[in-house]
């Protein structure tokens, strides 16, 4: 195994990863855009089966804080629109990113309320409650750290239900507090619920390009319980009526997309039922229904839940609910991506530029791996030194494969050479590379993060393809500087075109990842020279053995 063969192994792993990405994308195809119509009727299999009715028409009120711009419907108190002023829709745009939306083309809402036997949101008790509010617009004023938006409803029996949204400065977590005043003579059985519903089909104005084979990220539902910290639930699965039905204390339900999430976190000591539902008309839902509580006559009951609506900021999400930070989609290598991101964030706190932070973390990672790299090159050099003996043995033994294998292993043992020594560092490097890929694709901090010159967004592909070309050039130089024993004509042709093939693949990769690979290649060139000099002194390398 030599450097040329290592590149073949990397290529095989890389292509395998691309095939896996494409396969994942094919399993979750983006359906054709269709117009979504809102309906107030309740279909079989809908969320109403969980005691959660469909929305009706009411008055729309607005709530503005320093980080949120919400529209709430007084019919039921659902959040029908959410704008995030701190995050532009596109790079350089003054238009804020829209997370929740209620239009004829697309539905994405955060619903909540009180169901159960006596809850005003129970379909058996009539239309959803039409809340009264003091005014149509609420604004978090300068110097104000908390904003409360109370909404009240009194039913035919005289019972009063108050739903209060509590906003805090700089916070994407919104507490929803309920007060139930029982003025009757019988106990009221009340259960809180929280539901997220969304159109499966993405209209053009919602498409972020995350379905690109190189930029593919998860869009769908998720939930968490003490037993299952983080489980994804695909929209297609819900649409096929393969629905979730789990009971657990604690936990949360969420809907995810690249960089942003909404989540309902029940705040109670009882058991919650987590469910999904196909609502029809191309709309799916995930939600929770809490264990009912009794509010005795003459008493006032209090219940609460929390809505997260905003960017996937890991430390803030972790403070809101256990494992909510896992919604940052780092894939199956999250256990590598998370510490890498913490290190990257720590570096950024000093240098203030995410691009330079990526460069520094590349040097750190490659520095830590230098002993493995040195062992890899040493093993490959010893293997090259054994090639004449191996060739002579093959000629001597002819077609006797069994004896060839036995004598070859004896030769490796006598010369203290591990034939897999050149592969081991690759096995470690590839997961790190993939973990960096997931980290760059999932970390909101890198969205629209500039580097220098023409790179204004490290999470997007290079608009002029300069970085991928530079990556291909560095790969070409590594090839030219590496000794080789590849004699097969087909392998030689593959090696010749390898930099070109990788350059084409990397045209669609995030600029931050390509930057990492360029710097990593430059470090490889430097480390190669240092290692080869040491090997020359030991008689294990000769510069005459380079490629011409």
Swiss-Prot record:
GO terms for biological process: protein insertion into membrane; protein transport. InterPro entries: Membr_insert_YidC, Membr_insert_YidC_N, YidC/ALB3/OXA1/COX18, YidC/Oxa/ALB_C, YidC_ALB_C, YidC_periplasmic_sf. The chain crosses the membrane at residues 6-26, 350-370, 424-444, 458-478, 499-519. One of its GO terms (cellular component) is plasma membrane. Keywords: Cell inner membrane, Cell membrane, Chaperone, Membrane, Protein transport, Transmembrane, Transmembrane helix, Transport. Residues 28-54 are annotated as: Disordered. The keyword Transferase does not apply. GO terms for molecular function: membrane insertase activity. The keyword Cell inner membrane applies. Residues 29-42 have a biased composition (Low complexity). Interacts with the Sec translocase complex via SecD. Specifically interacts with transmembrane segments of nascent integral membrane proteins during membrane integration. Required for the insertion and/or proper folding and/or complex formation of integral membrane proteins into the membrane. Involved in integration of membrane proteins that insert both dependently and independently of the Sec translocase complex, as well as at least some lipoproteins. Aids folding of multispanning membrane proteins. PANTHER family: CYTOCHROME C OXIDASE ASSEMBLY PROTEIN COX18, MITOCHONDRIAL, OXA1. Belongs to the OXA1/ALB3/YidC family. Type 1 subfamily. This is Membrane protein insertase YidC. It comes from Salmonella arizonae (strain ATCC BAA-731 / CDC346-86 / RSK2980).
């Amino acid at each position: 195994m030599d450097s040329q063969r290592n590149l073949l192994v990397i290529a095989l792993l890389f292509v395998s990863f691309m095939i896996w990405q494409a396969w994942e994308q094919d399993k979750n195809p983006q359906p054709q855009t269709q117009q979504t119509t809102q309906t107030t009727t309740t279909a079989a299999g809908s969320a109403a089966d969980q005691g959660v009715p469909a929305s009706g028409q009411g008055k729309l009120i607005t709530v503005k804080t320093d980080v949120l711009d919400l529209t709430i419907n007084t019919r039921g108190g659902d959040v029908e629109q959410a704008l995030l002023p701190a995050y532009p829709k596109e790079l350089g745009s003054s238009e804020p990113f829209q997370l929740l939306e209620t239009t004829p083309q697309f539905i994405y809402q955060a619903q909540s309320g009180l169901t159960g036997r006596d809850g005003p949101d129970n379909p058996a008790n009539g239309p959803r409650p039409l809340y009264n509010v003091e005014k149509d617009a609420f604004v978090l004023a300068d110097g104000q750290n908390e904003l409360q938006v109370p909404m009240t409803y009194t039913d035919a029996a005289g019972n009063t239900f108050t739903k209060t949204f509590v906003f805090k400065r700089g916070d994407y977590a919104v507490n929803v507090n309920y007060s139930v005043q029982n003025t009757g003579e019988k106990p009221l059985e009340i259960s809180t619920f929280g539901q997220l519903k969304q159109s499966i089909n993405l209209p053009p104005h919602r498409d972020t390009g995350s379905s690109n084979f190189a930029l593919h990220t998860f869009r769908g539902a998720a939930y968490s319980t003490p037993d299952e910290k983080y489980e994804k639930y695909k929209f297609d699965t819900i649409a096929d009526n393969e629905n979730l039905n789990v009971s657990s204390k604690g936990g949360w339900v969420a809907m995810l997309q690249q960089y942003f999430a909404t989540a309902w976190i029940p705040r109670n000591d009882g058991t919650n039922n987590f469910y999904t539902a196909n609502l029809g008309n191309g709309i799916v839902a995930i939600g929770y229904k809490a264990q009912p509580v009794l509010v005795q006559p003459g008493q006032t009951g209090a219940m609460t839940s929390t809505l997260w609506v905003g960017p996937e900021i890991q430390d803030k999400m972790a403070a809101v609910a256990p494992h909510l930070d896992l919604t940052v989609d780092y894939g199956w290598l999250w256990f590598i991506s998370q510490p890498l991101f913490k290190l990257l964030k720590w570096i950024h706190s000093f240098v203030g530029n995410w691009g330079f932070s990526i460069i520094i973390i590349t040097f750190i990672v490659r520095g830590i791996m230098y002993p493995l790299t040195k062992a890899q090159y040493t093993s490959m050099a010893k293997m090259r030194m054994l090639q004449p003996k191996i060739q002579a043995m093959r000629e001597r033994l002819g077609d006797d494969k069994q004896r060839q294998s036995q004598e070859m292993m004896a030769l490796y043992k006598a010369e203290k050479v591990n034939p897999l020594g050149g592969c081991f560092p690759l096995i470690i490097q590839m997961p790190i590379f993939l973990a960096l890929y997931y980290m760059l694709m999932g970390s909101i901090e890198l969205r629209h993060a500039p580097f220098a010159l023409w790179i204004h967004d490290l999470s997007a592909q290079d608009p002029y393809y300069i970085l991928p070309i530079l990556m291909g050039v560095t790969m070409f130089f590594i090839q030219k500087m590496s000794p080789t024993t590849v004699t097969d004509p087909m392998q030689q042709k593959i090696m010749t075109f390898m930099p070109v093939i990788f350059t084409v693949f990397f045209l669609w990769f995030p600029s931050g990842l390509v930057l990492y690979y360029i710097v990593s290649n430059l470090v490889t060139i430097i480390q190669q020279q240092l290692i080869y000099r040491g090997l020359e002194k030991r008689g294990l390398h000769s510069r005459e053995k380079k490629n011409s």
